[in-house]
């Protein structure tokens, strides 16, 4: 089994030709082997292409989300996670780059931290956003120099190529697969561009990390990562990324245009408000678990009598669990089998778990 599954979501359109180019570059550059598998997940595309054959010819995994009517990064990530063979996941956007040297460091940290077994262990990666000039200038150098070139530009603040720095990439996290699935992955109510990664990251931090001190006014948004006060959710999000900085591990985000094709950018404000709503209720905000691929579509009825249960961890592997008290199917102290059968058909139940006391 591979140590790491890297999930790369993408969707093509004529307005964004660079996406196809970057998918091809990644499929050629990365090598799937016994330590790492690369999973390219295509969401909605409005442009025809032959990338499936190209990706598979380079010995990577290709998946297609046939249900998407509009492109969703979150849905692509969720599908990739369900199908991943490794117990550890990393999500990498098609615009982002990690060097092979840094992948080697990540693989070593995965083993040292035992992320495959420790569901609360994380690696949060910092990201350097590059300007338009960097897209062409970097290609004049051998890729083995890219890490040093970009980091030097960042550290001495030349900003020849660096647009800005974020201490945490909220979308590129190394996480235990079971934990990701039991937390429900990306909330698919976020439509189009923005904030599904913030929403997930907040739930991950709540579940996996205990902080001695939390920022004041968590709902405050500094709107950038250049803050000087421990205030707002960005200061909370930034805390874990510095560890990877000390190891010299960075993600580089290449510049791209942002056309609003297929209304992809249109819902950003709505997504922003949905994120704030969830953030204000962070202690209670919860999603149903996702399932591994072989359990997708399974619906399990958990019938109990005196005690309700929470089988989130089991749900990941057996299917979506619906909890019902057996008394709901009684009338005048008599079990009405027709009520139970109607419920099974209506909810399309495929399995039943019974409380031992029934």
Spans of features found by a protein language model:
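N-proximal low-complexity "stem/linker" segments adjacent to membrane-targeting elements
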Residues: 1-25
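Acidic donor-binding segment of Leloir-type glycosyltransferases
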Residues: 23-66
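Glycine-rich, basic loop-to-helix element that forms the pyrophosphate-binding segment
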Residues: 66-84
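Short aromatic/hydrophobic "clamp" motif used to bind/position activated sugar donors
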Residues: 89
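Acidic donor-binding/catalytic loop of UDP-sugar-dependent glycosyltransferases
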Residues: 96-109
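Short beta-strand-to-loop element that shapes/binds the nucleotide-sugar donor at the catalytic cleft/hinge
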Residues: 118-140
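Short, flexible, basic/aromatic active-site loop/helix in glycosyltransferases
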Residues: 142-165
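C-terminal catalytic/acceptor-binding lobe
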Residues: 192, 196-313
């Amino acid at each position: 089994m591979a140590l790491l599954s890297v999930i790369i979501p993408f969707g093509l359109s004529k307005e964004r030709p660079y996406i196809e180019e970057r998918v091809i570059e990644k499929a050629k550059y990365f090598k799937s082997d016994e330590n790492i598998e690369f999973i390219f997940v295509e969401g909605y595309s409005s442009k025809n292409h032959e990338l499936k054959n190209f990706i598979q010819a380079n010995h990577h995994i290709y998946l297609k989300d046939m249900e998407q009517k509009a492109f969703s990064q979150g849905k692509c990530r969720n599908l990739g996670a369900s199908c991943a063979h490794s117990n550890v996941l990393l999500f990498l956007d098609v615009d982002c780059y990690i060097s092979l040297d840094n992948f080697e460091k990540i693989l070593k940290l995965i083993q040292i931290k035992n992320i495959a077994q420790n569901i609360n262990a994380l690696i949060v990666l910092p990201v350097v956003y590059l300007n338009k000039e960097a897209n062409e200038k970097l290609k004049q150098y051998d890729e083995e120099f890219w890490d040093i070139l970009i980091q030097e530009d960042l550290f001495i603040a030349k900003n020849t190529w660096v647009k800005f720095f974020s201490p945490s990439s909220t979308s590129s996290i190394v996480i235990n697969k079971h934990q990701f699935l039991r937390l429900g992955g990306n909330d698919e109510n976020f439509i189009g561009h923005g904030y599904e990664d913030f929403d997930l990251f907040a739930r991950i931090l709540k579940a996996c990390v205990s902080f001695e001190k939390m920022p004041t006014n968590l709902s405050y948004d500094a709107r950038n990562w250049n803050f000087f006060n421990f205030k707002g959710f960005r200061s909370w999000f930034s805390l874990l990324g510095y560890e990877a900085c000390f190891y010299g591990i960075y993600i580089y985000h290449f510049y791209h245009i942002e056309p609003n094709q297929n209304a992809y950018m249109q819902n950003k404000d709505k997504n922003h408000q949905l994120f704030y709503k969830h953030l204000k209720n962070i202690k209670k905000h919860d999603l149903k678990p996702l399932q591994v691929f072989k359990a997708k579509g399974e619906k399990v009825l958990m019938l109990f009598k005196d005690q309700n249960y929470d089988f989130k961890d089991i749900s990941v592997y057996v299917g979506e669990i619906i909890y019902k008290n057996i008394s709901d199917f009684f009338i005048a102290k008599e079990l009405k089998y027709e009520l139970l059968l109607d419920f099974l058909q209506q909810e399309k139940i495929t399995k039943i778990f019974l409380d031992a006391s029934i």
